[in-house]
Amino acid sequence: MSDRESATEPTGLALDVRDLRVRYGSNEVLKGVTFSALRGEVVALLGPNGAGKTTTIEVLEGFRMPASGDVSVLGSDPARGDERWRARVGVVLQSWRDHSRWRVRDLLDYHARFYAPYATAEVPRPWDVDELLGVVGLTAHAEQRVMRLSGGQRRRVDVAIGIVGRPELVFLDEPTAGFDPHARREFHELVHRLSDFENTTVLLTTHDLAEAEKLADRILVLDRGAIIADGSPDQLALDLATKAEVRWTVGGERHVHAVEERDPTEFVRRLLATDPDVTELEVKRASLEDTYLALVQRVESGQAEEPEKLEALS
Amino acid sequence: MITTETLGARGVAVRAGLHRGWLETKYSLTDVGDIFWMLIFPVSFTVTLLFMRGSTVPGTDLALGAMVLPSLIGMSIAFGGLAGPAMQIATDREDGTLLRAKATPDGMLGYLIGKIWFFGLTTLASLVLLAIPAVTVISDLRIDGRTALLLPVIFVVGMIATVPIGSALGSIFKSSAQSMLIMLASMLLIAISGIFYPITAMPTWLQWVGQVFPFYWLGLGTRSAMMPAGAEAAEIGDSWRTAEMFAVLGVWAVVGLVLAPIVLRRMARRQTGSAIAAAREKIMTRGY
């Protein structure tokens, strides 16, 4: 029996999460999170700090027990995932000072050894260590000790260890934290390569909208334990944008109107129908960045309202 | 379900673990800090020998230094097996080494095999270093077939009796800073275990405390392997008590082997990226 075959979901879903709830004591950090990811898809979990991104990813990695909900990762419940399942999942951890005196090549080679028994006809495991060092741009540092690496180089070691078993699904928690722009760009290319050439499903967390836009096929916006938006970057801008600005000129006089509805088309149609002298028409939709910032702000101000309501009740 | 595939994977993990132990030993031998620790026993033994010049074991004409060497060998085994893993596991938990093992298929098995092999090899290395000052008292010792047979057995039994319990202790402590307590406790136990001073010269109640822990019994075992006939007169009950020694070490081994997997599994379950981030945060702000 090929484990690859039995594991392939008929639906093509790599991830399926329904009504996931996690509690720390009496504090509910995830309040019913539901989403899924297709095979080969790059999904970004975007949200401000403390939104529950890391908790979500830790449940999916099998490192944290949820209070309730159905979680399926490559067809298995991560809480019961066996070693064979583990071999198909890549976890990119944030290195700190672990294995600091190991040489880069030794460390990667050590981790690669564990995956050889899990190779299948379709997926040769693990990656060739030297080839992978080339892919992550560490060939020149192969003999260097981990402690001598820069933050960005160390992060690339983390990525290499996370994907050395040629996983079908990779989890990346805040992958580019502390990267300089050059390292960030190289890392983005690596993620694209994983999804385009290896057909690897990628779930990453970030609080950086620009990064989510650049990397992800789909963005999930998480805030205070709930998903508040789910879609492609373009869709998200449409769904979340509440305002568009319409500017025009009539007889040398400039007019500005903020359209409160989602779709400004109707307003523009009426404007053009009623006033034939309109020139220099301009419709500006709020950028996704404006939208995200507004959303974070809205949620934060919403948080401030709650205690007031309580006061009014008592 | 255990299939041939999982058995194969376990075998690969065990081999990877041995490779890990060997690599870590190599790294350790190029690390100034580690070499310092390895030299502690040989150097302290040399100092002890200097202080003990001319002293003899009470009631015999045996050089006191000759009695200390076998005791030190026993202590090195106990120390390398107990304090080493305890401190290392606490550190590895805090810095994410264990989480990496958890994220790798059969990685925990590889990690544990690697640790046992690593502590075995480095303890052996420090024993070899101990042999250098030992030549000065070798003429007072009895090195024969019995030594060649008993010493390796005691080394292996000692490792089995201490590494699991040391690993379990290391997983109980909340931070690597707390695990330094193990170091202090070990020092105290060594002081009352008859290694630097004959246990028979201590108050009876302290003798009993000393006899609970593996330090005393490993020291006794290695003395029995190397001391000349008649030296047992300086021991409790005028005997090497070989059967009792293996019995007590056996009990420690069983306790450790039962306890360690339970405690380690419990600790490993609690390991998450955010727990490590929290530990890092704490250490960064505190500075240790």
Language-model features: locations:
Chain B
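Membrane-interfacial helix-loop-helix junctions in multi-pass membrane proteins
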Residues: S193-G256
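Aromatic- and glycine-rich beta-strand/loop motifs that create alpha-glucan
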Residues: M1-F41, R269, G273, G287
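Hydrophobic alpha-helical transmembrane segments of multi-pass membrane transport/permease proteins
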Residues: T30-S55, G65-G84, L124-S126, M183-S193, ...
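Transmembrane helix segments
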Residues: T48-T56, G170-Y216
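Junction motif at the cytosolic side of a transmembrane helix
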Residues: I2-T4, A243-Y288
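Hydrophobic alpha-helical transmembrane segments of membrane proteins
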Residues: G59-Q88, I154-P164, S171, A260-P261
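Alpha-helical transmembrane segments and their short interhelical loops
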Residues: M108, I113-M187, T242-F246, G250, ...
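Hydrophobic alpha-helical transmembrane segments of multi-pass membrane transport proteins
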Residues: S44-T48, G65-V137
